[in-house]
């Protein structure tokens, strides 16, 4: 997962020596692939090296401090953005809306997840080989020589775009990295004429999270693993953008409409893409 993407990034960077910055925008499973790829591409930076680089490019104090976080493929990490990505996997109750909360269907999907190959095992947290924690648990910390959380931390902006409803593949909680009680209530939804399908925006905020690396080994049940992933990822501030196509004729395709996969079928998601562009850091 993510190795081919990392190799492609390296090949592009080698061909384009003028590049200085890098951002990732990913949809669905691609968000998890991107998280793995940036861990492979992450390079820690010493303060002296970063200071010299900043002096060379004449950037402000904030950028100097940010550069100390490290680089991705030798470039300055700017935006890490995902659309409808199952950051917490799909094993937990109601994480796959298609099953309408049916425990029987969820258990059946869990048992048959091997059909989807390695990705299916990863998403259902069944990849417990050689007594290692499932990959998605490994990815909420720096595991071995893969600096998953350090790579995410190195980006100036981390944003998750999530479907509130009508996405039958990826649930709202897993795509927005929230607990059930943390989901915004409908009375809090906004009505923005510029972005009619964006109903809530949560600004990034630092959280005081009680997390230790040992937790990824201790978690055994589905709820324990989900809580560990939430704690691990929420050590970093995230911008959360909640999207609803409830009134759209294209709502049945919400999982693809959120990123306008095909204009003919998913054009109603254009305002979501414009929102991403308007808030993109450069």
Feature map (PLM): residue ranges:
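Serine-dependent carboxylesterase/thioesterase catalytic core
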Residues: 2-133, 144, 156, 167
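Extended, polar/charged low-complexity intrinsically disordered and coiled-coil segments in eukaryotic
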Residues: 54-62, 68, 100-282
